[in-house]
Amino acid sequence: TIWVGTGESANRNSSAWGDGIYKSEDGGKTFNNMGLESTHQIAEIEIHPKNSNIVYAAAIGHLWGYSGERGLFRTLDGGSSWEKVLGGLPDDGKTGCTEIIFHPNNPDIIFAGFYHRLRQPASFVSGGEEGGLFKSVDAGKTWKKITNGLAKGKSGMIDISIHLDNPDIMVMAYEADEKIPDGEPGTGVYISYDGGESWKFLLKHAVRPFYHGQIEIDPINPDNIYVVSRGFMISNDGGKSFYQRRWRTDGGDDHDMWIAPYDNKIMYLATDQGSRLSVDAGKTWLSHNNMAIGQYYAIGVDMRDPYYVGGGLQDNGLWMTPSNSREFRGILNMHSTWIAEGDGFHTQIDPEDWRTVYTVNHVGFVARQNIETREYTFITPTPETITNFTDFVEYDYDETRNRYTIDPGEHWFFRERPDRPLLPPQFRFNWSSPFIISSNNSKRVFFGSNHLFQSNDRGDNWKIISPDLTTNDKNLRNTSDGGGLTNSNTGGENHFTIVTISDTPIDKDIIWVGTDDGNVQITRNNGTNWKNVRLNMDDVPLKTWVSRVEASKHKKGR
């Protein structure tokens, strides 16, 4: 029997929701929906070790609103019916359950983690007073909140791991307010030696708990503790010391880990790119790249015959793949060509020269390259390459330290990396910033932030050809740290941005853009004047994400 909970419990603003919990009784050949459809996201499932009809489901609930069901649910009849478990657990309609785990020797002892979070287009509530760690010793009838040794105040995401041979030893990844002073228990790793009644703070560690935040204790040797995030924090002395190790799993972000209870050298990792297996305690890894789980954001095509399709994937770079091959087995993995790193997004190929390819990485990094010679040039608009930059922003540049200020010296902005452009904070770039090649002139390109940029020399120089085309509602603008207990703004939270651009071969001066906050803007004179035509659209809610605008190539005005 296999149980599957649907909906992504990692709280990115791109997280998908599901339709409840599924059950298979034939080893996965067929599945039946067993209910809990309105929970949207189920974070954990635990089956009673002595009675398989008793199943607990940790429902974190709707990410984008306080509707639907959330909390801890239980079935006593194999899923035919469900009840919400209360008895002291949060029931405020805002706090969901993210963790449920049985004591390995006594299933009457259960631990649950609760978490309050809410995403809005330009903000993120992560953490609250009602959440935290809860323990039951009477099979879930009553619960008490555990606070001894833990950080004071609000709590966020929680993950727990219990040692199998000695269940008194437990470890926990616990999110708290990052403003807690150093030296006091805060966000990071905790350990318990008395079955979860009290906790000791071991390590301050906060790498996007809402997205990573997993922890595992070696089932055989409790001295080995693994904190799973972007890379690992590892202890081999029971938490007295930790070191960071970026295992060469080639998986991008790591999200979950399983260690075989019978052999602690066997480990599985769940990553953005698939599963990884180690049989030597992480020294080497085998990548299972045979899963069809690639997540494309956007694609482009060239004019070769056979044509190539280029596209960017979540944490798997940007690739180009032919539409045909001479291989009798068809198109194989080896026919694809890696062209850029990171989170990959828009890929555009010069229609007159297939060797010239434009690639976009997350949050506004765009590059031009010759895919034959591998000559690579970053062309993101910067104060140095925007010809009319000072018409929009006044700034002073400190060349000796590669930084600039917009408020004479009060706040300095540094280049993120030496090989990457300097992005002024006035320009808000979407996680997937739109880039197109003009349908009128292959040397003309457009790039969107909250303003529209135009280049007539393939991105070497830029001109801002619009005001802020978004609503730029300052009352809704995100905080710089994302709004969570710990810094959660990784760029994906940027809002009030342009997300789609289109021009038309019928008239080189007509350009359309759509924004993530509902605007549809058009210029008929190459940016001199703009008109928001959003209100001309009936029956479409305000602030709706305009995912695509496509100007007709055949009829003017359409």
Feature map (PLM): residue ranges:
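Beta-propeller blade termini and top-face loops
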Residues: 1-558
